[in-house]
């Protein structure tokens, strides 16, 4: 399920909640996969993940779509694409894919995998592009 939001035509984003989490019995805050457009500084399609827990220090998050894998750097409970050059390919993979898997490690050492559906992603992306163009 994809939701899109627009804040005064300046910040627009897609937010998706996971359809599956492993392990499923963790006590954690809200977690989501996001794509954000920042109109004022002309930043578009910025991917990020909020996990609802603090990451292991200096750890990387692995985001996979089909056979494609991307590394995200972490700060507290958020992660962003480590190599901005891969952003266009990541978005292309999201448009063509069915699911995103996000693998991360908490500050306690717990390995966690969240799975997100990409149903409706292309339509939601078009909506935020139109709203924040």
Give the residues covered by each predicted segment:
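A generic "folded-domain core" signal
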Residues: 1-133
């Amino acid at each position: 399920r994809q939701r899109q939001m627009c804040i005064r035509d300046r910040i627009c984003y897609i937010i998706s909640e996971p359809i599956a989490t492993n392990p499923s019995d963790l006590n954690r805050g809200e977690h989501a996969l996001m794509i954000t457009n920042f109109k004022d500084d002309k930043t578009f399609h910025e991917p990020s993940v909020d996990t609802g827990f603090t990451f292991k220090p200096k750890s990387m998050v692995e985001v996979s779509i089909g056979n494609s894998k991307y590394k995200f750097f972490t700060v507290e409970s958020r992660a962003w694409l480590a190599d901005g050059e891969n952003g266009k390919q990541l978005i292309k993979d999201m448009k063509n894919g069915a699911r995103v898997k996000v693998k991360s490690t908490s500050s306690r050492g717990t390995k966690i995998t969240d799975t997100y559906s990409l149903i409706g992603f292309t339509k939601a992306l078009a909506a935020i592009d139109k709203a924040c163009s």
